[in-house]
Curated annotation (Swiss-Prot), chain A:
GO molecular function: SNARE binding; zinc ion binding
Cellular component GO terms held in the UniProt record: cis-Golgi network; COPII vesicle coat; cytosol; endoplasmic reticulum exit site; endoplasmic reticulum membrane; equatorial cell cortex; Golgi membrane
Name under which the protein is recorded: Protein transport protein sec24
Single Gene Ontology BP annotation: intracellular protein transport
Species annotation: Schizosaccharomyces pombe (strain 972 / ATCC 24843)
Pfam family, one: Sec23_BS
Major localisation: cytoplasm
Listed SUPFAM superfamilies: beta-sandwich domain of Sec23/24, C-terminal, gelsolin-like domain of Sec23/24, Helical domain of Sec23/24, vWA-like, Zn-finger domain of Sec23/24
InterPro entries from the UniProt entry: ADF-H/Gelsolin-like_dom_sf, Gelsolin-like_dom, Gelsolin-like_dom_sf, Sec23/24_helical_dom, Sec23/24_helical_dom_sf, Sec23/24_trunk_dom, Sec23_24_beta_S, SEC23_SEC24_subfamily
UniProt-annotated stretches for the region Zinc finger-like: 255-281
From Swiss-Prot, chain B:
Cytoplasmic-facing ranges: 1-288
Key words, A-Z: Coiled coil, Golgi apparatus, Membrane, Protein transport, Transmembrane, Transmembrane helix, Transport
Coiled-coil ranges per UniProt: 37-66
Listed name of the protein: Integral membrane protein sed5
Native species: Schizosaccharomyces pombe (strain 972 / ATCC 24843)
All residue ranges annotated as the t-SNARE coiled-coil homology domain in the record: 218-280
Chain's gene name: sed5
Organism taxonomic ancestry: Eukaryota, Fungi, Dikarya, Ascomycota, Taphrinomycotina
Length: 926, 309
């Protein structure tokens, strides 16, 4: 229909021109065709390359070439502004058509002055007489125009847009099943890709955009107020075999010579497959000569079966030019706090035994992995094992001003060669220091010594710390002040207190050293300062609050997480770059890494359980029907292989704000708001962090009300948003009520710091559970919940987080991915207690950290199955949640902690969901 | 790369061979009756489907075997094992019934030639053997799983016991139930919003008051425990401070001694200064008459100057 309208409009132009008989306006009727030809150019290329037959391919190629030449001619004419004509008559259509043909032929003499037509002319047979050439050019340009129009019609039919449906936020309960639903689909036809494979575009579990339809101009993006960002999760499992991706093994890597983007499913092949046009910058590149040849089997291979042309996520095995040195082995240096508090709380014993259990799980296929152990108190205790020796030698360095390595070799132990010595060392590690009374912790000198030990290789420093560092460089003071909590000055407690940890992080990043912190608190631990090292060296921070090994839940949680951490197949010496199509620039990067240059993120080691957010800016007007983003990560695997992981996502473009809002992804927007607010909390104040969340939400609602909501002239103006964004207010409210951002005088700075660390690194599915926990009802769950079916263990339906749904006789489960809570109402009948826990009354249940008993009862079996399923929902996480039992008549502090997760209820400093909507409505009205 | 995957080549070769054999079979079957051909195809199709399903079950068994044989502590995936076990059990039972149905089909065609009957029975027996082997493997894996679960439980108990033995239970023993009840003096919250949810029932009012009293008692105990914790940490800090103080005092001993000597010098110097000042005072007293003379001259000069003007 739109094409017919365009054709009719062109007719009207022609009619007017015919009437006026003005020669300069003779080119106006051709003007509307230019856009269509330009838009359909990728189709021509794709169709040409999709055909394997030479004859048809040549014909298509000729059509494509002819299509390009008239575009250039018309392009020069496009500079003139269009002249509008108001008068037209239908009976003039036929004469207009004739006039159009005449115009086209008249345009033919112009080509000799342009370079592109010369290129086209060169392809015609030189023996033909000149008048024949002219006629041929005219004929082909005509067929190109008609072909372009038909392709345009197909394109319009093949690109449906997402429907924009408005909902009134007041009139419905939030549908929390949307949190686990897929994002709005990316309506990009597979014909844009070289092979048409269903896996050509990136699945949402790897790369997720806040808008799945990109505006063509920056002004439209700014007017829409929706942030444009990508949430990137290069790995979704701790080990490769749980989520394998295709591997390109022949080391033939083709990249655009201008923008350096790797060849991908959306590259456009031309010239009978010998060249391809970059889908990012549009330049033509040569295809490598050996692209179609399998050098291993010495046979011709099918190009269209190559993984990088069929899959959006591939691993390339890198050739020699991508290596600056031999691949680095996997190195772990364990810096273990052996002060009195560490020994007494059982951390040293539990850690040494857990490491001993994990020695077989550390990736070590090539036998190159190395470990080292340094004990830290008021001195540094090194342990030396000669290859083949059965005993370790302890070397004590008391000089903390200039810590030195007491021996040149045998401090870094090859895991396979020194296995016996390492095992004996770990078995006796606890008893060696059992009688210590030393309360000092020289973490700074220990870090320096560890860095000196591995600075020529790179690797991981794993710090297990139970007390505040108080000796040597990097010592910290007890600066926690309860009077500051809940006030504006609380933000100073979240800032680093010592510059050593920042400057040392830069040193570590430069020499490919990554630092991970496992912090066990007896009292104040200054997580805000110590988490600086993991943040800038792509490590992670774990915090075990008031940890003691005599509680089996504490011991098992730490041991499980440490073994998961050690068995993770991390990537080493990695750099990551995100490239976009012409006109797009990456402006901000969020996550745990070191920004080496404006767009290069350096990772001394790349963990598999984190995600990253990249903000995008539109710098120039986009003229193509789709844009591409490519995340390339060059790394060394823990098995000594140099690889490049490439993730390519392509998004259609639009100039309609309706399409933009209909394709917005509320989960990705919430993640972007989370990481941005976390950074604000660390760099300025908590108030600014909270305000940034609310103000962005208000802006979005304002734009929606002004531009997209239906014209409502009634007195009661509803608060409206599109269906795909209807949970965004709830997520923003939950975020402002989260431990990391909530205004409260009861949250210590350590707990707030660790919450901010989680908020800025958790992948999307886990972050959503962390922000908006999942509530299940267990006493009245459906009969199939907790049982095993073809789809695995069935989970009950999630409920909204409002205590109005809680019954005083019920049993409920709340899962935040970091903690799990079992809430048993005070009026629970004894039969429920017997079936679930094997006890006769509430008094027999001990509140607090809890281990679910295993008894031979159907309800107990189902609850245990549900708990186990929730713990294994995501294979890309090392966290084992702590389980707490909350009794309806139990400890008020435990209950207030439990009910603080009910974000739809009003609490001391925050409104309920409906009150929040009312506040938003008032702000939007202003 | 230590090996190259040539599965695609093998499958291509198999496909070619199969197509060649199919052609030969088609040629042989030209003279056969259509009904017999159709019946054989049906039988072969069912048998082939059953064989494929047995193979798929075998693959699942292999994965289950990998998961079940993991002996490392903390490397357990109970939910995954549970799900795989369920799927395999379902597959085995459905396969068993399918083979029984196939056997009925074979018995129903007794009037076929003896050689064909023998072949059909052989196929059925072969499928039954495959299923039996798969079931035996499944049983073995489940037994291994049971043993590994017991061993893992024992090792976990040993692990926890050794950790507890090394740990001092008194440290971090209090206030373990809530992370927010630490570092500060916990102020008892009224929690009106949560408690008021149940006030609608008049019958529960008395129990609610008793619960509140109990909560207050618990709160008081927790308060005392927190206070003791604070006192303990404060005493520890004071100990550190006193140690530092003693160290500073010992370092400054020489300085103090020098200060003492300087003080003695100061005393003697002040004595000398006092004697000098006394002498000056006496001299100033004896010159009093001279002062009077000078003062008189000044006054006279002043008066003369005033009269002249």
């Amino acid at each position: 229909m739109s094409q017919e309208d365009a054709f009719y409009g062109k007719g009207s132009y022609g009619a007017s021109s015919g009437n006026s008989n003005i020669p300069p306006q003779g080119f106006q009727p051709v003007y509307p065709v230019a856009g269509q030809l330009d838009n359909t150019a990728p189709y021509v290329g794709a169709v040409a390359e999709g055909t394997a037959e030479g004859i048809v391919s040549n014909g298509e190629y000729a059509v494509g070439a002819m299509g390009a030449a008239p575009t250039n001619i018309i392009g020069s004419v496009d500079q003139q502004p269009p002249v509008s004509h108001t008068s037209h008559k239908s009976r003039r259509q036929y004469p207009a058509e004739v006039f159009e043909l005449t115009n086209t032929l008249a345009a033919s003499p112009a080509p000799p002055s342009l370079s592109e037509p010369s290129y086209v002319m060169a392809r015609t047979p030189s023996s033909s007489p000149y008048p024949h050439d002219r006629a041929e050019v005219g004929t082909k340009s005509l067929s190109a125009q008609f072909g372009g129009m038909s392709l345009g019609a197909d394109g319009a039919a093949a690109m449906p847009t997402n429907e924009l449906v408005s909902v009134d936020l007041y009139n419905q309960t939030p549908e929390i099943s949307d949190l686990t639903s897929p994002p709005p689909p990316i309506n990009l036809p597979l014909s844009y890709s070289a092979t048409g494979a269903a896996t050509s575009n990136c699945p949402p579990k790897y790369v997720r955009s806040t808008i799945n339809c990109v505006p063509t101009t920056n002004s439209l993006l700014k007017k829409s107020k929706i942030p444009f960002a990508l949430v990137i999760r290069p790995y979704t499992s701790l080990v490769e075999e749980d989520d394998p991706v295709p591997v390109v093994t022949d080391t033939i890597i083709s990249r655009c010579r201008r923008c350096r983007m790797y060849i991908n499913p959306f590259s456009i092949f031309i010239d009978n497959g010998h060249r391809y046009r970059c889908n990012s910058c549009g330049i033509v590149n040569e295809v490598p000569q050996s692209y179609d040849w399998d050098s291993f089997r010495n046979v011709q291979r099918d190009r269209w079966q190559r993984p990088e042309l069929n899959y959006a996520v591939v691993d390339f095995i890198a050739p020699q030019e991508y290596m600056v040195r031999a691949p680095q082995p996997l190195v772990y240096v364990f810096l273990i706090d052996i002060s009195f508090v560490s020994i007494s709380s059982g951390m040293v014993g539990t850690a040494s035994r857990a490491i001993l259990e994990s020695l077989d799980r550390i990736p070590n296929k090539e036998g190159r992995a190395k470990v080292a152990f340094i004990g830290v108190d008021s001195a540094l205790h090194f342990f030396s094992v000669s290859p083949g020796a059965e005993e370790a030698t302890q070397l004590v360095v008391s000089d903390l001003e200039e810590p030195f390595l007491p021996r040149n070799q045998d401090l870094l132990l090859n895991l396979r060669e020194c296995r016996q010595g390492i095992e004996n060392l770990l078995e006796r590690f606890q008893s060696m220091f059992a009688t210590t009374r030393d309360s000092s912790n020289a973490l700074g000198p220990g870090l320096k010594a560890a860095h000196r030990l591995i600075e020529n290789i790179g690797g991981k420093i794993c710090c297990l710390i139970s007390s505040l560092p108080n000796v040597g460089v990097g010592k910290l003071e007890l600066r926690e002040d309860p009077k500051l909590l809940g006030t504006n000055r609380e933000s100073s407690l979240l800032h680093p207190n010592d510059s050593f940890y920042k400057s040392f992080a830069v040193e570590c990043s430069t020499s490919q050293v990554s630092v991970d912190m496992f912090l066990f608190s007896s009292q104040y631990q200054d997580v805000a300062t110590l988490s600086c090292l993991p943040r800038y060296t792509s490590g992670k921070t774990q915090f075990y609050h008031r940890w003691n090994a005599s509680r089996s839940e504490d011991a098992l949680k730490f041991a499980s997480e440490l073994t998961n951490y050690l068995s993770m197949e991390i990537e080493l010496e990695a750099v990551m770059r995100v490239r976009g199509s012409n006109g797009l620039r990456m402006s901000s990067f969020y996550g745990n890494f070191f920004n080496r240059s404006s767009d290069l993120c350096a990772f001394p080691s790349f963990p598999r359980d984190q995600s990253y957010v990249v903000e995008v800016v539109i710098e120039d007007t986009i003229t193509k029907p789709f844009v591409s983003f490519q995340t390339a990560m060059l790394h060394t695997t823990c098995n000594g292989e140099r690889r490049i992981r490439v993730l390519t996502i392509s998004l259609p473009t639009t100039n309609s704000m309706t399409d933009l809002y209909a394709s917005a992804d509320q989960v990705a927007i919430a993640q972007y708001l989370t990481v941005r607010a976390s950074e604000k909390a660390l760099s300025s104040t908590l108030n600014e962090a909270r305000d940034s969340i609310i103000s962005k939400l208000v802006e979005i609602l304002e734009v929606y009300k002004k531009n997209l909501a239906g014209q409502n002239t009634g007195a009661a103006i509803p608060l409206q948003i599109s269906t795909n964004l209807r949970l965004l207010p709830l997520l923003c409210l939950a975020l402002t009520k989260h431990t990391g951002f909530r205004r409260s005088s009861h949250i210590s700075s350590d707990l707030r710091s660790i919450a901010l660390c989680y908020l800025s690194t958790l992948p999307t599915p886990l972050l959503m559970r962390y922000i908006y926990p999942t509530l299940y009802s267990l006493h009245d769950m459906p009969i199939e919940a907790g049982t095993v079916t073809e789809q695995g263990v069935v989970l009950p339906s999630a409920l909204n987080l409002t205590s109005a749904l809680l019954q005083s006789f019920g049993l409920y489960l709340v899962d935040t991915h970091i903690h799990q809570f079992l809430y048993i109402g005070k009026d629970a009948v004894p039969q429920l207690l017997i079936d679930a826990f094997g006890v006769n009354s509430l008094a027999d249940l001990k509140a607090g950290r809890f281990t679910m008993p295993v008894i031979d009862n159907p309800l107990n079996v189902r609850i245990n199955a549900i708990l186990g399923k929730l713990r294994s929902l995501d294979k890309g996480s090392t966290i084992m949640p702590s389980l707490y039992l909350v009794r309806g008549d139990g400890d008020p502090q435990l209950r207030s902690w439990f009910f603080s997760h009910f974000v739809e209820d009003r609490s001391e400093n925050s409104p309920s969901y409906l009150q929040f909507l009312q506040t938003l409505k008032e702000k939007v009205r202003d | 790369m230590s090996f190259q995957d040539r599965t695609a080549e093998f499958q291509a070769c198999v496909t070619k061979t199969r197509s060649r054999l199919r052609t030969t079979t088609a040629n042989q079957a030209v003279g056969g009756p259509d009904q017999t051909k159709h019946q054989k195809s049906e039988f072969t199709r069912i048998a082939q489907k059953i064989a494929n399903q047995i193979n798929q079950t075998g693959e699942k068994l292999q994965k289950l075997s990998q998961l079940a044989k993991r002996k490392t502590l903390f490397d357990d995936r109970p939910v995954e094992i549970q799900e795989l076990t369920f799927q395999i059990k379902q597959s085995l039972s459905s396969l068993n019934s399918d083979i029984a149905s196939l056997q009925q089909v074979v018995k129903g065609n007794r009037n076929k030639p003896a050689q064909m009957n023998q072949h059909s029975e052989n196929v059925v027996v072969s499928l039954q053997n495959s299923l039996a082997n798969t079931s035996m493997t499944f049983k073995d894996i489940l037994e291994i799983r049971t043993q590994n679960m017991k061993a893992s439980q024992n090792r976990t108990e040993k692990f926890v016991a050794s950790s507890s033995m090394n740990a001092n239970p008194l440290i971090n023993s209090g206030n373990s139930i809530s992370p927010f009840a630490d570092y500060n003096d916990p102020k008892p919250e009224a929690n009106e919003d949560y408690l008021s949810l149940n006030l609608g029932d008049g019958a529960n009012t008395r129990y609610e008051q008793m619960a509140l009293l109990e909560s207050q008692t618990d709160t008081y105990s927790q308060q005392r425990m927190s206070s003791i914790q604070n006192i303990e940490s404060t005493i520890t800090e004071l100990g550190g401070i006193f140690s530092q103080l003693a160290q500073m005092v010992s370092e400054q001993r020489e300085t103090v001694q020098r200060i003492d000597m300087h003080t003695d010098d100061i005393v003697s110097n002040i004595g000398s200064a006092q004697r000098e000042i006394v002498k000056f005072y006496e001299r100033m007293s004896s010159n009093r008459a001279l002062l009077f003379k000078i003062f008189g001259i000044v006054i006279i000069f002043f008066l003369l100057w005033v009269l002249v003007t």
